[in-house]
């Protein structure tokens, strides 16, 4: 019987690449969700015939409802944030793949876990903003949390030897360095949205591409790694690997290092999460070592790229510190993409939010949303 998948965020970059994998493996799509892209999700409905579709934007939901009217095979339409949670909770799928962007993914992740579903997680904000809540829920409900980020998938793959995993002493979290690698503050001062959106290796959405340019993406991934693998931040070293071939590595107590390599294509970690624990032939070409010639490794510059420094501060503060950093970044990136602030303002604002409070202590889901709101408000007040 074909594996059934609910895919949250099916029209985005990770969502469409996930459908490439689903198509190649002959999996069944149980449910899809999107925000506004009606035409795109209509094409997906035509091909994959899901039982349920959620449109979180009400106007888009109305347009989709009209487009599906009268069709005998039309999926049941869910709407709004409550519809997204309903979709994540529904019995039927073997795996829920959360590829939503932003803090909106946290509630859906928790709902999927609490409903007993294994969760393939591409929404990094789930762990960044609510890592304590997510890991507690995973332990309570006995489900699997399968990382989809290329770096965390690489680490996860390197730790599959259950005998060696307890001897883990260090994680080497790789970064491409983004389009501005090697540049200093003065050079970055005049960088524009168009400059920042030119990633050297990966094909990603606008928000995550900006995060790669500021190194915020790597800061968020550092926070994720703390929650996923149980090491303190000082045991996680960020290494710039410009070719994006070494996706991350782990070091053990005997100082041996195991790394995962592959072409820079998100369909590799997506497929591993969906086929785990099996490995099967996929849609990505093999790595040609002869063509590589050279692999380079450098230190990440958190003196220049202040988003990375802010994330390190945030995870050391604990509590809602990472949530505050994430909310500030989401708001600052939105303003940058609207040409309302400069490139360096993103790091300035994120660091200012992290420095503004202690953020310690346990928290609830309501606390997460309130912290996110306050961080965004802080950014708007300190332009």
Positions of PLM-derived features:
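Catalytic, metal-anchored helix/loop core of enzyme active sites in primary metabolism
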Residues: 1-383
């Amino acid at each position: 019987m074909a594996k059934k998948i609910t895919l949250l965020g099916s029209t985005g970059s990770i969502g469409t690449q996930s459908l490439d994998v689903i198509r190649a493996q002959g999996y069944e799509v149980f449910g899809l969700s999107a925000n506004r892209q009606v035409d795109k999700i209509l094409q997906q409905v035509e091909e994959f015939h899901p039982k349920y579709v959620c449109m979180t934007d009400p106007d888009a939901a109305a347009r989709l409802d009209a487009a599906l009217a009268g069709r005998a095979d039309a999926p049941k339409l869910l709407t709004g944030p409550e519809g997204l949670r309903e979709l994540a909770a529904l019995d039927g799928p073997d795996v829920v793949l959360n590829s939503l962007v932003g803090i909106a993914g946290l509630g859906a992740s928790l709902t999927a876990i609490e409903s007993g579903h294994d969760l393939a997680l591409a929404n990094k904000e789930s762990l960044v903003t609510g890592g304590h809540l997510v890991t507690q829920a995973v332990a309570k409900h006995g489900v699997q949390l399968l990382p989809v980020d290329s770096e965390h998938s690489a680490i996860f793959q390197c730790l599959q030897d259950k005998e060696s995993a307890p001897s883990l002493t260090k994680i080497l979290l790789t970064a491409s360095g983004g389009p501005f690698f090697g540049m200093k503050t003065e050079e970055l001062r005049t960088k524009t949205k168009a400059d920042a959106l030119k990633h050297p290796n990966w094909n990603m959405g606008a928000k995550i591409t900006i995060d790669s340019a500021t190194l915020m993406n790597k800061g968020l991934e550092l926070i994720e790694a703390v929650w996923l693998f149980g090491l303190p931040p000082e045991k996680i070293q960020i290494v710039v690997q410009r070719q994006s071939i070494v996706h991350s590595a782990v070091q053990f107590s005997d100082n041996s290092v195991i790394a995962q390599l592959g072409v820079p294509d998100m369909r590799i970690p997506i497929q591993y999460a969906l086929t785990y624990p099996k490995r099967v032939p996929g849609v990505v070409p093999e790595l040609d070592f002869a063509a590589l010639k050279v692999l380079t490794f450098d230190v990440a510059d958190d003196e220049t790229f202040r988003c990375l420094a802010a994330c390190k501060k945030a995870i050391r503060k604990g509590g809602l510190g990472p949530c505050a950093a994430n909310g500030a970044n989401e708001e600052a990136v939105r303003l940058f993409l609207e040409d309302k602030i400069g490139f360096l303002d993103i790091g300035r604002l994120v660091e200012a939010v992290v420095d503004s409070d202690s953020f310690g202590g346990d928290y609830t889901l309501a606390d997460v949303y309130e912290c996110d709101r306050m961080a965004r408000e802080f950014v708007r007040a300190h332009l």
